[in-house]
């Protein structure tokens, strides 16, 4: 679903009304504001929409690529919401979760923060970012939930061991292992940057839209808008067929 930004009011799906704990995962790994990170304005819109139908606990959680505290970044981005618990994933207990795909692409299991597993409804909220020829939307946004301490290589920080496996394959595996209920893509602006993985050096285009939907479907629509064929989304489509075959066998 694509909605004009000026008209956007977050209307949660009916199943959220049953949730006792809702986790919102923004893109908050940089101190720079939108479109590099998720805006406080959109998060506030989503929180207000949840409050309209639910008294659930609302949590916001993310982690930094350096493994340092994320709380100073939350503050710099203006993330100050009433009755919302702000969390740094590095403080979580991490539990190893098996990939449900028997023929996984790169990773057989992931270390996942327990706060995700203990939440009833999961929302990934990302900017509209395109890195080279691949979209970095709501599915790719999940990467920073993983512990840097377990996935960094010889150099401190980041998830270099996962990048070495092929990040597009890793993101497809992560989608199935960490299934989020909803993806929200903040496409008021579109940010395009090159393969050096530095979104602060990208080019920005105005677009004025918000995309909402199941994460793979919302991301696929965003990729079409961007004119790119995002590899991990293609792999997810194949993985869905594999899961159906597993269930039928």
Which positions does each model-derived feature cover?
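N-terminal and secondary-structure boundary signal
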Residues: 1-249
């Amino acid at each position: 679903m694509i909605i004009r930004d000026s008209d956007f009011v977050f209307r949660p799906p009916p199943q959220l009304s049953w949730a006792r704990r809702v986790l919102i995962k923004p893109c908050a790994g940089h101190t720079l504001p939108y479109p590099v990170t998720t805006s406080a304005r959109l998060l506030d819109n989503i929180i207000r929409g949840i409050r309209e139908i639910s008294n659930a606990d609302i949590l916001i959680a993310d982690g930094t690529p350096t493994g340092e505290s994320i709380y100073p970044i939350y503050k710099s981005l203006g993330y100050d919401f009433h009755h919302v618990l702000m969390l740094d994933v590095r403080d979580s207990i991490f539990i190893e979760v098996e990939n449900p795909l028997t023929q996984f692409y790169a990773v057989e299991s992931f270390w996942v923060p327990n706060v995700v597993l203990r939440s009833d409804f999961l929302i990934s909220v990302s900017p509209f970012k395109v890195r080279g020829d691949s979209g970095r939307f709501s599915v790719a946004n999940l990467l920073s939930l993983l512990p840097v301490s377990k996935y960094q290589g010889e150099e401190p920080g980041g998830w270099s061991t996962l990048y070495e496996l092929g990040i597009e394959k890793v993101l497809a595996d992560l989608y199935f292992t960490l299934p989020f209920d909803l993806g929200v893509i903040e496409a008021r602006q579109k940010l395009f940057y090159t393969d050096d993985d530095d979104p602060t050096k990208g080019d920005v285009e105005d677009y004025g839209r918000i995309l909402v939907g199941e994460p793979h479907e919302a991301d696929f629509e965003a990729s079409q808008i961007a004119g790119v064929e995002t590899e991990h989304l293609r792999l997810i489509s194949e993985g869905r067929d594999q899961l159906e075959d597993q269930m039928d066998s």
